[in-house]
């Protein structure tokens, strides 16, 4: 017996025409880790048994859940997952986002079929397929001197038995691009005091030209499983509110962020991740700070300002949204 190696794992993804029905191109996801699993719920019988044994255990619901972790880069499948997170019309996993096209958070739910292959590198390949996988959460993290990393969480409506043969075949290879780092000047945070713009030119340096050492962006679609009588499979997956939160650490060189917190003053933030070759911009035109701390942690340390924030609904022109995503904006 040869033991399977995590280094030989491959994850394929395809869009779906309906919840649980794969359709279109199949692409390879580039990941650093994954935790995609079946989640089976059971109930135990309450029958009184004089032998003190539990008489039975029955399955009552079945779904999939888990996360994929990745190093953020210019990558077509990742683009389409981002579209799904935003509730925008789902694109092709082989094409990705269209350059210089706005993606606003909306109400269209997209789903994917994901197949995980594990292998011993010799004769045994095992395949787990999860259907109706709806993007639930996103966490992007950037810290000085590191890659920009991401985690996407899924909720799925369909779990299949493990097999030794594949049901998906990649039609498009993984895009070979270099992960974005925080060393590149195109990965940055910009500030707009007016709190009503998605025009790049309106965003400038942080107040007092403060320098950020880290930032994060979190998106939560508030998904919920919709169970049903007559089947252990989910009837569907419900969407809740589109919630955007984040954090930022800056050197404590200016009073603006602190006073914005005290006065609940709204402002705009632009989180840009990229390189000289490509970039992604996340516009948050109305942000409210929910926590600010300025602490002297100890000797031989810099004084830092730790900021937590939440983005709220904004109206810019005819668009009503919380976050706008644009790739390679002109």
Each language-model region and where it sits:
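Signature of extracytoplasmic/envelope-associated structural regions
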Residues: 1-330
């Amino acid at each position: 017996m040869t033991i399977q190696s995590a280094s030989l794992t491959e994850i394929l993804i395809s869009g779906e025409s309906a919840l649980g029905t794969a359709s279109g191109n199949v692409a390879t996801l580039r990941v650093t880790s994954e935790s995609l699993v079946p989640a089976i719920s059971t109930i135990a019988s309450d029958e009184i048994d004089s032998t003190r044994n539990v008489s039975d255990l029955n399955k009552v619901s079945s779904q999939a859940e888990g996360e994929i972790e990745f190093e953020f880069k210019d990558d077509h499948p990742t683009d389409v997952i981002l579209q799904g997170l935003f509730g925008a019309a789902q694109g092709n996993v082989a094409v990705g986002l269209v350059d210089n096209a706005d993606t606003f958070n909306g109400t269209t739910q997209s789903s994917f079929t994901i197949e995980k292959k594990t292998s011993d590198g010799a004769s045994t390949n095992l395949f787990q397929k999860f259907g109706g996988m709806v993007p639930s959460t996103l966490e992007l993290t950037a810290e000085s001197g590191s890659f920009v990393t991401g985690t996407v969480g899924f909720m799925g409506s369909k779990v299949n038995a493990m097999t030794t043969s594949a049901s998906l075949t990649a039609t498009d290879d993984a895009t070979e691009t270099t992960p974005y780092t925080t060393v590149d000047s195109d990965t940055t945070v910009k500030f707009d005091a007016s709190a009503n713009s998605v025009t790049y030119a309106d965003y400038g340096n942080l107040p007092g030209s403060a320098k950020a050492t880290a930032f994060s962006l979190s998106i939560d679609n508030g998904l919920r499983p919709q169970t049903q009588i007559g089947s252990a499979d989910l009837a569907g997956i419900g969407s809740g509110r589109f919630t955007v939160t984040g954090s930022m650490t800056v050197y404590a060189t200016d009073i603006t962020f602190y006073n914005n917190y005290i006065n609940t003053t709204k402002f705009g933030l632009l989180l840009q991740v990229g390189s000289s070759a490509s970039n992604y911009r996340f516009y948050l035109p109305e942000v409210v700070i929910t926590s600010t701390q300025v602490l002297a942690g100890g000797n031989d340390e810099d004084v830092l300002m730790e900021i937590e924030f939440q983005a709220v609904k904004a109206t810019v022109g005819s668009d009503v949204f919380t976050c706008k995503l644009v790739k390679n904006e002109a």
